[in-house]
């Protein structure tokens, strides 16, 4: 067996996360260790891309902090991620939403997909 696969299996978290795609608004609960204290920080934003596959899959979340756009990349199998919650399902036609970086205000909004149920 390949040594890389053995290492990946050893560090796999085994957590189940909900399925989401680009355009969805998600809240990521991320564990942060500061010195000897540990806290959970919630990071809410729009998923602008999902890259990689398998254990190396990662997603980029963009949020507005005041007037500045902040993007953060999270590995999906990170042990520091407590939970991922999907808040809104967006209706987009692209897999990578880089065009949102240039838009501000109401133009940067994403339509919400209606779910019949």
UniProtKB/Swiss-Prot annotation:
The keyword ATP-binding does not apply. The keyword Ribonucleoprotein applies. GO terms for molecular function: structural constituent of ribosome. It comes from the Bacteria. SUPFAM superfamilies: Translation proteins SH3-like domain. Pfam families: Ribosomal_L19 (PF01245). One of its GO terms (biological process) is translation. InterPro entries: Ribosomal_bL19 (IPR001857), Ribosomal_bL19_CS (IPR018257), Ribosomal_bL19_sf (IPR038657), Translation_prot_SH3-like_sf (IPR008991). Signal peptide: none annotated. GO terms for cellular component: cytosolic large ribosomal subunit. Keywords: Ribonucleoprotein, Ribosomal protein. This protein is located at the 30S-50S ribosomal subunit interface and may play a role in the structure and function of the aminoacyl-tRNA binding site. Belongs to the bacterial ribosomal protein bL19 family. This is Large ribosomal subunit protein bL19. It comes from Bacteroides fragilis (strain ATCC 25285 / DSM 2151 / CCUG 4856 / JCM 11019 / LMG 10263 / NCTC 9343 / Onslow / VPI 2553 / EN-2). The gene is rplS.
């Amino acid at each position: 067996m390949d040594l890389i696969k053995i290492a990946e299996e050893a560090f796999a978290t085994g957590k189940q996360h909900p399925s989401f795609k680009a355009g969805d608004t998600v809240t990521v609960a991320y564990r942060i260790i500061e010195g000897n204290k540990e806290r959970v920080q919630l990071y809410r934003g729009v998923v602008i891309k999902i890259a990689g596959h398998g254990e190396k899959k990662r997603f980029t979340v963009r949020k507005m902090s005041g007037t500045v756009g902040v993007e953060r990349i999270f590995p999906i199998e990170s042990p520091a991620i407590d939970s991922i919650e999907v808040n809104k399902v967006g209706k987009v036609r692209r897999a990578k939403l880089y065009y949102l970086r240039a838009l501000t205000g109401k133009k940067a909004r994403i339509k919400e997909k209606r779910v019949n149920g």
